[in-house]
Amino acid sequence: MPSDDVYQTRDVQHFEHWSRSYEHSWMQRLIFNRVHRAALELATSLPPPVSVLDVGCGTGRLLRAAALRWPDARYLGVDPAQGMVAVAQRLTPGATIHRGVAESLPLPDASVDLIFSTMSSHHWRDPAAGVREIARVLRPGGHFILIDFGLPRPLAWLSLHGGGLPAATRRRLFSTAGLRIERQRTVAYPFILATLAAR
């Protein structure tokens, strides 16, 4: 269980405030909807999952879209902002939404078939720990789809956060965590990189 100071960062406070208007934000149309479509498209070649986790789930939009594709799966979400968790719980009643961070997921080992993390990893305090945690909760043969900025600092405002994860960094972090990259390509925009990996 993360300590309370994990939830006191500027990023988390920003998302607490944004949770009230997040569902209708221009960012949904400009970035998030495109990224979510790309994530689901990457997953089309995979076996239907029994369980799906979204790390940094926000208000649960990707979970709701995934549930239309795989209605029989079990859905889980994790987000550090309590406001986002509350909205996700209200709008995604079939899912179990936890308050938590990527670096300390509140889930058992080898418990999830498919894990998404979209436009979230640049907010993680420790990307290596986040990838290790994802590998820990992923079942053998399961898949992880990470979509986020693929350049260290593609936009000036990103310097307020941890920066993106370039392809070489992802290869190193994933390999160290025991994940094998199957596909990697840009999606939505040239500076957004999608990585599909297996355990």
Kindly give the residue locations of the regions a language model identified.
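Short N-terminal helix/helix-N-cap motif within the alpha/beta-hydrolase-1
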Residues: 125-129, 154
